[in-house]
Amino acid sequence: MTTGEIIGGVLAPHPPHIVYGENHWRNEPRAECGWEVLRWGYERARKHFLEKKPDVLLGHSPHWQTVIGHHFLGMPEFHGLSVDPIFPNLFRFNYDIKVDVELAELIAEEGRRDGLITKMMRNPNFRVDYGTIVSCHMMNPEWDIPIVGISSNNSPYYFSNEMGQQQMLRLGEATRRAIEKSGRRAVLLASNTLSHRHFTTESDKIGRAHV
């Protein structure tokens, strides 16, 4: 088997506004465009990485928070309606997600070998968080590449930032080893909002910002 590799990583913003601005058919609310600069950045990243023909996208999301261990989406498919709790008028997204369960299980196994607590999410009715959905959608709106969804285990940070960072490094090393063993070509998405400062009001001219 060919050795797998991480072919790229993306600091992948997940505000729901950018999906809203796209007017994608999976999202129910309609917009007059908007947030173009961030969307253009995604378009450039999308073109760059999809040309490399990745086999899988790995999304690590802070909005899937777990207290005991690192959790992984563990069903071949997840379907449902994701509604943003802060901006329900912008994001009501009908998702249909394919998961690379084999790779997810391999990462979980590698993590356990390194002393991490890991768990597979086997509930078919589990509602996938919008951080995972937005970052994966903006990188691949066709949704024709399977994903691996990884939770954000916050409990080590209750002790100290150093302990939390040590856990993240071990998770990253386990992820790398699993990808290499799997033979997959993977793109890593660090789902985030950086400053976490959202627009709280919507301008009447948002759709004409770059006309």
Predicted features and spans:
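Active-site His/acidic residue clusters
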Residues: I18-Y20, H24, H71-L73, H79-G80, ...
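Short catalytic/ligand-binding loop motif for oxyanion handling, primarily in non-cytosolic enzymes
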Residues: Q65-G69, D129, S195-T200
